[in-house]
């Protein structure tokens, strides 16, 4: 199929293959969720602003996107998320006070929150109809370009950021790509699970996807994690607004439709450790891991943890 693309009055034609190989510079961050697992904290602050050590979850997601070459950041938000917008705004009063006190190190830290003018956009998801619907809400900003999706709940610790690893693989394959990891069979019902057509090591050719299958229905133990590189055709599939698991519009179903249309979908086994910061246990595990990884905190924090474990053992 050929596509007519209009850009500032210039017309071009591109094949599907050319679109699939185009460089990915846009990312969608679905951040409209209420974060009810973290009430009462999330009554007044977005879950994405909750911090691992001294950085909010959204900062880890932004840093990963930047490292992968993303230039345009699209946030799909909802009511009560204004703190996310404030976080990426300039803070002249704070900066002036830090300059007055000569706190150059803190001024330098604030630079990570700086966004280039026009690089960030906010789209409101009016109704909570699922992840697929949240992605679909950004369709006009995506237009006919391939794009990434990052779920800030999934924080991945790795030497090379997960999305950057995926981008390198995508440059060779094109198509649609999802981050994947092995999960225990009893936990498969919490994920989208891949049906594997060909296992090539880090890369897996996918023949099907099932959202939150029952344990006996899971086609493999390879689960989808919150990183995606997708073609614009996904938006066409989402536009049909078919309800899937839990009565929601599922992104997994839109990707599965690409498989049915004989378009390439790959799973990518990333190198790194994933933390589910959408759960309290996962958030605490990430806090410990990221705290221990900090040179300025490791010794004191490790000693504290050792002491806590010793006290618990002595009390048993």
Identify the meaning behind each predicted range.
Residues 21-99, 125, 161-165:
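N-terminal glycine-rich phosphate-binding loop and ensuing alpha1 helix
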Residues 148, 167-171, 200-303:
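Catalytic-core segments of class I nucleotidyltransferases/pyrophosphorylases
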Residues 49, 120-122, 176-178, 265-267, ...:
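Conserved beta-strand scaffold positions in the cores of enzyme catalytic domains, especially
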Residues 94-97, 108-196, 232, 238-241:
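Conserved beta-loop-beta/alpha segment of the NTase-like Rossmann-fold superfamily
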Residues 6-9, 17:
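Residue-identity detector for glycine
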Residues 26, 71-73, 119, 146, ...:
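Residues at the starts of beta-strands that form the adenosine-phosphate
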């Amino acid at each position: 199929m050929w596509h007519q693309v209009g850009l500032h009055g210039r017309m071009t034609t591109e094949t599907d293959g050319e679109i699939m190989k185009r460089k990915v510079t846009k990312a969608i961050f679905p951040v409209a969720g209420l974060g009810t697992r973290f009430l009462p904290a999330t009554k007044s602050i977005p879950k994405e602003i909750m911090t691992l050590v001294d950085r909010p979850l959204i900062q880890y997601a932004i840093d990963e996107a930047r490292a992968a070459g993303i230039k345009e950041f699209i946030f799909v938000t909802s009511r009560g998320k204004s703190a996310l917008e404030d976080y990426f705004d300039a803070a002249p009063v704070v900066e002036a006070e830090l300059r007055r006190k000569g706190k150059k190190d803190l001024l330098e830290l604030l630079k990570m929150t700086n966004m280039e003018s026009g690089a960030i956009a906010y789209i409101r998801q009016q109704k909570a109809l699922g992840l697929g619907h949240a992605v679909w809400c950004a369709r006009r900003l995506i237009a006919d370009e391939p794009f990434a999706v990052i779920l800030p709940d999934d924080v991945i610790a790795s030497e090379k950021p997960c999305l950057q690893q995926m981008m390198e693989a995508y440059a060779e394959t094109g198509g649609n790509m999802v981050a994947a990891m092995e999960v225990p069979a009893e936990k498969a019902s919490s994920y989208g699970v891949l049906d594997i057509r060909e296992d090539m090591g880090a890369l897996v050719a996918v023949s099907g996807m099932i959202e939150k299958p029952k344990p006996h229905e899971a086609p493999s133990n390879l689960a989808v994690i919150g990183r995606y590189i997708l073609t614009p055709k996904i938006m066409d599939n989402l536009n049909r607004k078919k309800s899937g698991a839990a009565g929601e519009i599922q992104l997994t179903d839109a990707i599965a439709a690409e498989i049915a249309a004989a378009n390439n979908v790959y799973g990518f086994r990333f190198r790194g450790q994933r933390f589910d910061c959408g759960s309290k246990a996962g958030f605490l595990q990430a806090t410990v891991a990221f705290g221990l990884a900090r040179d300025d905190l490791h010794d004191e924090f490790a000693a504290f943890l050792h002491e806590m474990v010793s006290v618990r053992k002595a009390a048993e």
